């Protein structure tokens, strides 16, 4: 076996980044679920005010960690530290994650958090058993859309998700004409 000519040393960082990627995903999905970006679009806030407005009952340190995680991922900006920190949306978050804006693209991410995240957690079982790992699991019915139309709430969430994921295509189409 020959080794490719390269001066680069093997590096596990990409493996670790992808393997632990659910940390970043869940931070973003929870922030969307809490409508944090909508809250911060109207006013910059400190961690204490955010904790109160969102009804969080965890420790202040956990709130700092949650918010600072979002800062490190580029979804929030921060001025100051700890109790003196003021948090605001990053430009992208302000445009695409504020539910009150027509540019809101979080619908697909809401569905990812509410439905898909759990199902992907059962990928191993699905591969081993061949059984569906979504709402049709155990029902013997593989017709996802039939089940979807039975629940107005799930249908609305699905439609919002599809709208969010297609928004960029619609904008491109309009720009062409």
Question: Predicted regions: what is each one?
Answer:
Residues 2-6, 11-49, 53, 60-177:
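Conserved Class I S-adenosyl-L-methionine-dependent methyltransferase catalytic core
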């Amino acid at each position: 076996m020959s080794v490719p000519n390269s001066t680069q040393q093997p590096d596990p960082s990409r493996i670790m980044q992808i393997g632990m990627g659910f940390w970043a995903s869940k931070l973003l999905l929870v922030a969307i679920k809490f409508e944090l970006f909508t809250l911060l679009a109207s006013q910059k806030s400190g961690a204490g005010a955010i904790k109160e407005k969102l009804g969080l009952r965890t420790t202040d340190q956990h709130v700092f960690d949650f918010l600072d995680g979002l800062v490190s991922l580029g979804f929030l900006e921060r001025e100051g530290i700890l109790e003196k920190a003021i948090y605001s949306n990053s430009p992208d978050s302000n445009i695409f994650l504020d539910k009150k804006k027509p540019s809101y693209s979080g619908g697909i991410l809401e569905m990812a958090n509410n439905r898909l995240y759990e199902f992907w957690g059962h990928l191993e079982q699905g591969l081993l058993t061949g059984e569906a790992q979504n709402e049709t699991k155990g029902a013997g019915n593989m017709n996802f859309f039939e089940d979807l139309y039975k629940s107005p709430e799930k249908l609305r969430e699905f439609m919002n998700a599809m709208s969010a994921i297609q928004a960029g295509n619609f904008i491109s189409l309009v720009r062409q004409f």
